[in-house]
Amino acid sequence: MERFVLCIHWERRAESGAEQHRVPQGLAYAQDIYTQLKEYSTKYTSTFPACSLTGNPGTRKWFFALQSLYGSFQFCSSDWDDLCPAVTTEDNEEPVQTALDECLEALQFPDGEDDNSRDSISQTNLFEEAAELLHQLSDKLPAPGRALVDVLLFTPEAPKLKDCLSAIGAIKHLKEWHSAKITIVSKDCKGWQKIAKFLSANVVESACPKELIDSHELWRGNIEISERKFTSEVEFPEFCLRSVSDDKFPYFEHNGDDKNKAVLLPEVFHYYGTSLEYVQMVALSEIPSYFVSDSVFELSITRNALQGKSKLMLDQLCSLTDKVGAIFMLSCNVCSLPNPPALQRSSKKWREYMSRKPKDIKVPGVELKGEYCSYYFLIQGKGSGFCKATLLHSASQISGAASLVLLHQRLNNYQPGNMAEGTSEILDSVPHFRGEQIAVRERILARAQALAVNEYLKRHEALPHPSVSHVNNLRTLLAVTRERVIGDCESRLDGVSYKNLQNITVSTPTVSESEAMISNPADWPERNVLQNLENFEKVKQRLRASILSSSAEQLLGRKDGLKEGMTLLDAKELLKYFTPQGIAVGELQPLQVQRGDNAFLLTPKLTPKKLKGLPFEKAAECHYHGLEYCLDNRKALDRDVAFSELQSRLIRYETQTTCTRECCPVPFALSPLPSPAVLSEPGSVPDGESIQTELRGEPLLLKRRSRDLDGLYASKRLAKSGSSDSLVSLASEGSGHQPPTRATRLRPERAASSTSAVQPPSARVQMAPSVPAQSKQSTHPDLEQKESRSQKHNRMLKEVVSKTLQKYGIGVEHPCYAACNQRLFDISKFFLKDLKTSRGLLDEMKKAASNNAKQVIQWELDKLKKK
C-alpha cells in the first residue's frame, strides 16, 4: 500500500522581534519528517506478493503534504507530493520546489498588505480555512484500500476546542473514512487528552521521525470474527501487518535491475480490504506443505492501541503454540487501471452525514472495479508482543503445484532394491498365467487363423489369373494373425505376478496419506477455502446500501439480512428432516416467513394432498405458497418477464424526458429489441443533452421550436428502440392534430444521428419503404449539422487511439491496425464510461489508451502469428 503522510502545524506567532524570524518548532519537526521520508523512499520494502495472474503489485510510493497555521499565516499543499526519486533527470531541468520550501519562503518573505489584512481575522475563521484545505487534500486521496494515511499534528499547546472544532472535524474525517493514524506531538499532553480520545489519537512529547512513522507497515485495519448462526460479529481495531526486513539497496537500482529482467506480469493496482476475517483454527499437521509459502510477515497492534480489547486479542493470538494456528483472510481487488477517488467518502458527503448528528459513525461502502482475490495468513505466536503471519496459497493460486509436489515426493522417496535380489524380483515380475487362460488363448488363435485362411482362399479364387504358389503368402498371413491375437489376449487377460497372487488374499496394500487425501473428495484442502457465493452477494449488497437512507429504512422495515437470518437452520437441525439416503422424513411444510408486520397466513388444515384434489375455483381462494404460479392459467411467469423487460426500457426514456424538458404525454410502442438502459451505465451521457445545450445558447428560438423538439424527442425514442413497425402519434400542446410518423429501423451505432429523420409537425408526409433516407427534408438544418456530445467524444477517442497506435509503430498500413484500433477503442471506452464530468476528459482518454495499448498490440500480433 502507498504511504501518505500529512504534517499539520498549529502554533501562535511570537510577538517579540527576535523570535519572529526563527523557524517555528513545528516546521522544524516537519523538515525532519520530510528528510526521513525521502530516505525511506530510496529503499525498497518487500510488499505482499501477487494474488492474481492479472499482474504484480507496484512498488510502494511515499507522498507528503503540509498544512501550517502560524498566527494569521496560513499555508497548505495544493496536492500530495510524490517523494519517490526519478530514475533519470535532465541537467537543464530546474528542481521542483517542494511544499515545505514554499511554506518557509512565504513565511520568511510575507506579503505586507496581505499580512496586515489577515491580522483582524479571528481564530475560528482561521481554523475554518484550515478545515477546508484539509478537506481538499482528503478528496485527492486514492480509492480505499490503496493508501496508508498518517497524520502528524505538531502544536506546542492545545487551542480552544470551540475555535478549532471545524479543523478537528476534518481530521476526524480522515480518521473514520480514510483509516488514518493520528499522532499528536505536543508538550501539553493533558490539554490534548479530550481531543485525542475523540480522534483515537496517540499523544507523544518527542518528535523523533523513526518513532512517529513506521516504515515497515504494509497494512492497517481490524480483525473481524463473525458467528454465522446468530449473524453477529466482533471487531478488534488498530491491527497492522509489517514486513520482516527491508532491502538496503536504493530504489532506482532495484528498478533498474527489474527492467533488465524479463517481465512476465505487468504492474497492477491492489486495493486491500479493511479487516482480517477469521476463517478457522487448524492444526499444523493438517496443512499440506505445498500450501505454505516462504512469505512471512508480522502481525501486531499500532501504537494507538496499546491498551483495550485489541491488546487482549493479540495476547490470545500470541499464545498459539507451534502445533496450532489460526487462519485469517484478507480480501483484495486487483485492477489494471486505478479506481477513481470514492465519491461516497468525499468531504461533501461527510458534511451531509455529520449534519444528521449520527450516534455512531459508519463508513459508507465503496464498490471497486477489478478482480476479487484473497490472501490467507496462518497466525502463530512469535513472542515479545508479535505474531508470525505466514502467507498461505489459496486454491486458485495453487494450480498444478500440489500435483507437482506429490510427484517430486514420490520420486525422492523411491529407492531401488539391491542387485542381489534383482533376479528374484525379475522372476516375480514376470506375468503368471493359468492353464485355462493359455487354452482359451490357443482356441481363439486357431479360430482366427482358420477364418483368415478361408478369407484368403476366397479372394485368391476370385482373381482372374490366380498364382499357383502362394505358400509364402499364407505363412506371412498366419504370422501376422498370431501376433495380433496374442497381443489382444495379453491386454485382456489379468497378468499379475506370482508373489502378489499369493498375498492378495492375505493382506491388502496400504494406502499412503497423500493418495487417501486425493481419493477422498471430502478431505480435499480446496474445500476449506471455498466461499459461499450467496453470502458474499448479501455482504456486497449490504455494503452497497447507502448509510444516508435512514428514512427509506423506516419505510421499508428491517433489512433483508435481518429478516432472513431469523429463519436460517443449523446443520444439525436441518439433518433431522432427512434420512441418510437423502429422502425427506415426512411432508415438509413451508416455513412462515415474517415479512415486515404482515405475516403470510396459510389456510388452516391445508396440505399438498388436499390441494391437489380441489377444483381450480376453490384452490384459487386458498392461501398457500406458490399458488399464484401453480394454478394461474394466464402464465404469470411469462407476464412477469415481459413486464420486467417493459419496465427496464421505460426507465431511461421516462427519466430523460421528465428531467430535461416539460412533461408532454407521448404514447409510443416498444420494440422487442434489448433496451439501452440494460446495456448502459448510470454515468453515461444522454444523447438529448446536446439539444438542451443548444437551446440554452439560443433563448430567442425556444418558443418557436418547442413543438418541433417534441417531435424530435419522440422520433429519437423510436430510433433508439429500433422498431420498424410501430406508429407514434405526437400529442401537441395545442388542439391541433399531429400526423402519424413512421420511424425507420436504425443500427445502434447510428442511433445518435437519428435527428436527421425529423419531420415537421405541421406537414403530412407519407414515406414508403423504398424512399431513400437522403430524400427526407428537415426544417432545421442547424440541428442536423450540429455534432452531438456523444459523437464528439467518440471522435476524440478515435483520434487519441489512432495517435497512440502510431506511437507504438502500428500505422494505417499495418495489417493489425484495424483490429488494434477497434479493440483499443472498446477497452478505453469501457474505462471512461463511469466518468461523471467531461473535465479533463482528453487526459483520461490518453491515459486509458496508453495503459492498454501495449497489451492490445501484443494480443493482436500473437493472434496474427497463429494464423
Swiss-Prot record:
Composition bias, Basic and acidic residues: 779-793
A GO BP entry: regulation of protein ubiquitination
InterPro entries in UniProt: MTBP (IPR039061), MTBP_C (IPR029418), MTBP_central (IPR029420), MTBP_N (IPR029421)
Domain of life of the native organism: Eukaryota
Keyword list, A-Z: Cell cycle, Growth arrest, Ubl conjugation pathway
Residue ranges, annotated region (Disordered): 679-699, 724-793
Pfam annotation, one family: MTBP_N
Listed Low complexity bias regions: 724-735
Protein function: May play a role in mdm2-dependent p53/TP53 homeostasis in unstressed cells. Inhibits autoubiquitination of mdm2, thereby enhancing mdm2 stability. This promotes mdm2-mediated ubiquitination of p53/TP53 and its subsequent degradation.
Stated family: Belongs to the MTBP family.
Protein name per the record: Mdm2-binding protein
Lineage: Eukaryota, Metazoa, Chordata, Craniata, Vertebrata
Gene for this chain: mtbp
